[in-house]
Amino acid sequence: MASQGTKRSYEQMETDGERQNATEIRASVGKMIDGIGRFYIQMCTELKLSDYEGRLIQNSLTVERMVLSAFDERRNRYLEEHPSAGKDPKKTGGPIYKRVNGKWMRELVLYDKEEIRRIWRQANNGDDATRGLTHMMIWHSNLNDTTYQRTRALVRTGMDPRMCSLMQGSTLPRRSGAAGAAVKGVGTMVMELIRMIKRGINDRNFWRGENGRKTRSAYERMCNILKGKFQTAAQRAMMDQVRESRNPGNAEIEDLIFSARSALILRGSVAHKSCLPACVYGPAVASGYDFEKEGYSLVGIDPFKLLQNSQVYSLIRPNENPAHKSQLVWMACHSAAFEDLRLLSFIRGTKVCPRGKLSTRGVQIASNENMDTMESSTLELRSRYWAIRTRSGGNTNQQRASAGQISVQPTFSVQRNLPFDKSTVMAAFTGNTEGRTSDMRAEIIRMMEGAKPEEVSFRGRGVFELSDEKATNPIVPSFDMSNEGSYFFGDNAEEYDN
């Protein structure tokens, strides 16, 4: 079972999981980055993009989406079988932005999926290079996590919108594999399971027959992934209960919501990786940098160094603040949507604001938006320090937390105490400890009650100067604890809509 002693590093998940040493892992991840870079260079040639246009993040997103769609076999099969008007199942495309006579113009391009697949494979030495595709999915997911607060999705499944810090990876496609599962938050897994159980309640045949067997094994697999994220025996035992249920129903939904709430204090292990847009990797490869030879890691200094030396541009709407747009993308690049803003401000070297205070909408431009008033500007993606990404939830303690988001999910392995609003979280746990999971519930509540405010997480870990590549001199930051720590504070972020 996934959680029992088979903890693999994300790089191993990203590299087909053979046990490899650090150098092999770095080379293997580098090879994946090379492939994305080469593909992007080729696509810029196909689309006749200038250097500036190729570094435009909106063009990068369109190209990334095209290749993801070209390899989405289930959807492609579905489109073939259910032809819809005006949609060619064999083609993929999107908006490409070009600078014409001093104005930005939108051009809709359409390509054969077969052609895109050919270009992708050619850039990846003939392989399908699924890991490169997953890498782009995680970048899109991180961008969504930073841009949207999934209030509606949480409410629909019976959870509380203040639990948004558990929702990392909630927009990742099902096909994102082990690397995708590693970056999903506890709330995301709970939401997927609840949706599944609800279908089973409404559809008598969901668990039955040949298909039902597949459904059941998917259900158990998801339970095991979630179990592997929990760090306490009681939370894991609860997941065993949910997994072994003969006929999952409302009792299981209750247990899942309970375990999600408990994760606000007894945080799960969620992986974090810095996945950058293709328009960062492309120019680096074009300049002659050999990622495979030099080696690359998604969780160390490498993405920070790469961003220090990259030029990325973005379209800006008339009333948007380019600095705010930069913050949004910077947070997405480091998978830091649910990290403590005080720590982010320290690492970035400029103040990082809550989502609701940002004068910026998402990065993507809708097809009905007016291009005449669009400007473009440079995204400031550099940082003052770098820090190691974590896959642990850190341990817990109490802090004044905000109305909008009542806990954090740490991204960086840096010493601090983690803010959460204990009274708010605990208020959700009154009463209901009866039923078959009563002993586990009581145990979980006891542990949460015991979480101490003064406890420090990631003791002794610090941030590093960008010149300190080997991470030899940790700098432990000191924080002004009176500042607001959470990003989705009493917020008005847009909703994410599929």
Curated annotation (Swiss-Prot):
Biased composition (Basic and acidic residues): 8-21
GO biological process terms held by the UniProt record: symbiont entry into host cell; viral penetration into host nucleus
GO cellular component, one term: viral nucleocapsid
Family annotation (SUPFAM superfamilies): flu NP-like
Matches recorded under InterPro entries: Flu_NP (IPR002141)
Keyword annotations of the record: Capsid protein, Helical capsid protein, Host nucleus, Host-virus interaction, Ribonucleoprotein, RNA-binding, Viral nucleoprotein, Viral penetration into host nucleus, Virion, Virus entry into host cell
Motif Unconventional nuclear localization signal per UniProt: ranges: 1-18
Keyword flag RNA-binding: yes
Subcellular localization(s) per the UniProt record: Virion; Host nucleus
Region (Disordered): 1-21
Major localisation: virion
GO MF annotation, one: structural molecule activity
Motif (Bipartite nuclear localization signal): 198-216
Signal sequence annotation: none
Post-translational modification: Late in virus-infected cells, may be cleaved from a 56-kDa protein to a 53-kDa protein by a cellular caspase. This cleavage might be a marker for the onset of apoptosis in infected cells or have a specific function in virus host interaction.
Assembly, per entry: Homomultimerizes to form the nucleocapsid. May bind host exportin-1/XPO1. Binds to viral genomic RNA. Protein-RNA contacts are mediated by a combination of electrostatic interactions between positively charged residues and the phosphate backbone and planar interactions between aromatic side chains and bases.
Similarity-based family: Belongs to the influenza viruses nucleoprotein family.
Described function: Encapsidates the negative strand viral RNA, protecting it from nucleases. The encapsidated genomic RNA is termed the ribonucleoprotein (RNP) and serves as template for transcription and replication. The RNP needs to be localized in the host nucleus to start an infectious cycle, but is too large to diffuse through the nuclear pore complex. NP comprises at least 2 nuclear localization signals that are responsible for the active RNP import into the nucleus through cellular importin alpha/beta pathway.
Name of the protein: Nucleoprotein
Organism: Influenza A virus (strain A/Guangdong/38/1977 H3N2)
